[in-house]
From Swiss-Prot:
Its EC number is 4.2.2.2. Pathway: Glycan metabolism; pectin degradation; 2-dehydro-3-deoxy-D-gluconate from pectin: step 2/5. Ca(2+) binds at residues 170, 194, 198. InterPro entries: AmbAllergen, Pec_lyase, Pectin_lyas_fold, Pectin_lyase_fold/virulence, PEL. SUPFAM superfamilies: Pectin lyase-like (SSF51126). Belongs to the polysaccharide lyase 1 family. Amb a subfamily. Disulfide bonds join 28-45, 128-147, 306-312. Residues 1-21 form the signal peptide. The active site is at 250. It comes from Juniperus virginiana (Eastern redcedar). This is Pectate lyase 1. Keywords: Allergen, Calcium, Disulfide bond, Glycoprotein, Lyase, Metal-binding, Signal. It catalyses: Eliminative cleavage of (1->4)-alpha-D-galacturonan to give oligosaccharides with 4-deoxy-alpha-D-galact-4-enuronosyl groups at their non-reducing ends. It holds the Pfam family Pectate_lyase_4.
Length: 367
């Protein structure tokens, strides 16, 4: 039988290993000191439901050299010109940039917008990023803040679709509608007119990872509305993100679909952390939740549209190996039928919730 001292040492060692565990996405590319010469390796590093996203891998590099914006007839060297091309492109930036778009920027499929190596800011009082009926998009290393509503106007959506009138947008940082295979990684998002990320209208195969969400009330919406049941096929991974400071609610808020929320770190929220309606499956695993000081805000979860607790009793909301501080608690419900939600290419190791602050310490844009 092991001695008490040996057991105590092993427990201590396990705690150290857990707290110092590597973030699997960052370990994939940041350990390479020559990543700048091998940028497209990043596309091999996604985990979760968006792990098949290739973005612009295998295509040409396109360098943004100008912060100018023409929504109808963009000039070569601008972000809009590269983002709307039909060809596969890996978009990088020649220098630090502050880009204020005049209309929403429609990002075509098979694109990576890679801000690494430059200090790139989008928003600044203008509208921001929009994806519709596209696949294979990676957004990495961008500061997106101050996104504002847009007006009805003409916009070049893509080379093939051309210029079309588009409705006014709400002022989200990133909007995805009917998008498949998208990966949103290592961005810093804050202070927009509406949400920071919307994933709606049948979008699926999405990973949202290593981002820093702060100074914003309604953070992340997954699912269009309670009548749009096509979102039942939605699958989203939310992993290794830092929520807060000053993040109010919707981290995320889901309608329908399957959402895996793993190894995120939550600062005190204003309303709730994780919520939903229309019977989404929400699997919370290895997160760290620190509740606000107010006693009535301690609950992590919020079920919306339930007349009584029993009305939502069969919703599958489960907490596994989460860590709770300052009185935070997760109200579980339902019974999960299938524990293996990922295939072998999507699966990743999820640490205990006590490790989440370490795993998310580099969330947001990496300097």
């Amino acid at each position: 039988m092991a001695s008490p001292c040996l057991i105590a040492f092993l427990v201590f060692l396990c705690a150290i290993v857990s707290c110092c565990s590597d973030n699997p996405i960052d370990s994939c590319w940041r350990g390479d000191s020559n990543w700048g010469q091998n940028r497209m390796k990043l596309a091999d590093c996604a985990v979760g439901f968006g792990s098949s996203t290739m973005g612009g891998k295998g295509g040409d590099f396109y360098t943004v050299t100008s912060a100018d914006d023409n929504p109808v007839n963009p000039t070569p060297g601008t972000l809009r010109y590269g983002a709307t091309r039909e060809k596969t492109l890996w978009i990088i930036f020649s220098q630090n940039m502050n880009i204020k778009l005049k209309m929403p920027l429609y990002v075509a499929g098979h694109k990576t917008i890679d801000g690494r190596g430059a200090d790139v800011h989008l928003g600044n009082g203008g509208p921001c990023l929009f994806m519709r009926k596209v696949s294979h998009v990676i957004l990495h290393g961008l500061h997106i803040h101050g996104c504002n509503t847009s007006v009805l106007g003409d916009v070049l959506v893509s080379e093939s679709i051309g210029v079309v009138p588009v409705h006014a947008q709400d002022g989200d940082a990133i909007t995805m509608r009917n998008v498949t295979n998208a990966w949103i990684d290592h961005n810093s998002l804050s202070d927009c007119s509406d949400g920071l990320i919307d994933v709606t209208l049948g979008s699926t195969g999405i990973t949202i990872s290593n981002n820093h969400f702060f100074n914003h009330h309604k953070v992340m919406l997954l699912g269009h509305d309670d009548t749009y049941d096509d979102d039942k096929s939605m699958k989203v991974t939310v992993a290794f993100n830092q929520f807060g400071p000053n993040a109010g609610q919707r981290m995320p808020r889901a309608r329908y679909g399957l959402v895996h929320v793993a190894n995120n770190n939550y600062d005190p929220w204003n309303i709730y952390a994780i919520g939903g309606s229309s019977n989404p499956t929400i699997l919370s695993e290895g997160n760290s939740f620190t509740a606000p000081n107010e006693n009535y805000k301690k609950e992590v979860t919020k079920r919306i549209g339930c007349e009584s607790t029993s009305a939502c009793a069969n919703w599958v909301w489960r907490s596994t190996r989460d860590a709770f501080s300052n009185g935070a608690y997760f109200v579980s419900s339902g019974k999960i039928e299938e524990t293996n939600i990922y295939n072998s290419n999507e699966a990743f190791k999820v640490e205990n919730g006590n490790a989440a602050p370490q795993l998310t310490k580099n969330a947001g844009v990496v300097a």
